[in-house]
Amino acid sequence: MNIVDQQTFRDAMSCMGAAVNIITTDGPAGRAGFTASAVCSVTDTPPTLLVCLNRGASVWPVFNENRTLCVNTLSAGQESLSNLFGGKTPMEHRFAAARWQTGVTGCPQLGEALVSFDCRISQVVSVGTHDILFCAIEAIHRHATPYGLVWFDRSYHALMRPAC
């Protein structure tokens, strides 16, 4: 069996563009958030998406206990917020950097996100270092922001959408 090494895999994955998201939660274990591009649709019946989260991440215990999350898809111009949530910045400073509303699950929704998916974690599957969180969508909030934000070739890029 031919095993692909980690660096080759990462280099190849940099060729796959992906939306930039801030994943948030709030509940009994507290408030937390992180930046993720490993998010995708699973099915529309029932509406479900998945989020991949490293079990070694400092936020993992909070998401694991709260069992709710909000996927906030970023707009162009929110790169600094993505960097803030992708680093070691304390949670209170991350959340202080933007306007948030509370979603139906109690999770923070980013006021200026392109779209927010408010979810309950319905199933968790562990693969390697990560948990795959299957998320049943309870509410969706779209915003009239004209530009999306993607991560491609290890940098941010803006995409203009033709209509909302």
Curated annotation (Swiss-Prot):
Gene Ontology molecular function terms on file:
FMN binding; FMN reductase (NADH) activity; FMN reductase [NAD(P)H] activity; riboflavin reductase (NADPH) activity
Task: Summarize induction of expression.
Answer: Up-regulated by the nitrogen regulatory protein C (NtrC also called GlnG) and repressed by RutR.
Top-level taxon of origin: Bacteria
Name the Gene3D superfamilies on file: Electron Transport, Fmn-binding Protein, Chain A (2.30.110.10)
| Catalysed transformations (reactions) | FMNH2 + NAD(+) = FMN + NADH + 2 H(+)
Q: Which UniProt keywords apply?
A: Flavoprotein, FMN, NAD, Oxidoreductase
| EC assignment | 1.5.1.42
| Single GO BP term | nitrogen utilization
Which InterPro entries does the UniProt entry name for this protein? Answer: Flavin_Rdtase-like_dom, NADH-dep_flavin_reductase, RutF, Split_barrel_FMN-bd
Can the keyword NAD be found in this entry's annotation?
yes
Asked if the record carries the keyword Protease, the reply is no
Return any one Pfam family short name: Flavin_Reduct
**Functional description taken from the UniProt entry:** Catalyzes the reduction of FMN to FMNH2 which is used to reduce pyrimidine by RutA via the Rut pathway.
Q: Which HAMAP family match?
A: RutF
Q: Which family does it belong to?
A: Belongs to the non-flavoprotein flavin reductase family. RutF subfamily.
**Name the UniProt record assigns to this protein:** FMN reductase (NADH) RutF
Q: Which gene encodes it?
A: rutF
